[in-house]
């Protein structure tokens, strides 16, 4: 994973990246499998007292703001969140609904798990969970809201990387044809709205 992260950072430094140029590098980490169960109930991704109560999460950074990290000027494709009241020192991350793990990619402080979901109307969508210290699932694994996907960094572990990585970067995706690289290569609202839902709005509408 360290080698993958080094190649990833080197590429961003020495050429002008685009989703079209970069996505094929990430395709090998993708498994194209169909979820066995529909995602008809949605939950917060943390072990909080009530996973249906939206104010049990704390939003640290919003969807759609502009970032200078990695690629200058890219748009934040997620919300960054933590439990409002963590129940333990180590914060675990859970799947938000029935689905299947379709990608585990990147390494170190950017480790990411992506879950593919099928809605009751047959529509396919994805949830993506980034900044994971430890991952407990693998590609092709069926998950539900009780599946522990990973755990987050502690503040102390985060310091090793010189940033504040002790939070969950949560994306709600319309599609995953970029195999993950749109997370850091989205530069305008057209690209943003083509692939991503606003997670804060999605949670408000579906977690209830």
Pin down the residues of each PLM region.
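Sec-dependent N-terminal signal peptides
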Residues: 3-12
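Surface-exposed, glycine-biased beta-strand/turn segments
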Residues: 16-111, 145, 158, 196-208
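Short, flexible loop/turn elements at secondary-structure junctions
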Residues: 63, 83-85, 97, 119, ...
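Intrinsically disordered, low-complexity boundary segments flanking structured domains
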Residues: 64-69, 114-118, 137-138, 159, ...
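Extracytoplasmic/periplasmic, Sec-exported soluble proteins
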Residues: 73, 91-93, 135-138, 191
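Short, solvent-exposed loop/turn segments that connect beta-strands within catalytic domains
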Residues: 87-89, 119-124, 178-182
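Zn2+-dependent peptidoglycan hydrolase active-site motif and core
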Residues: 95-136, 163-167
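Conserved, short, structured surface segments that act as functional micro-motifs
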Residues: 141-208
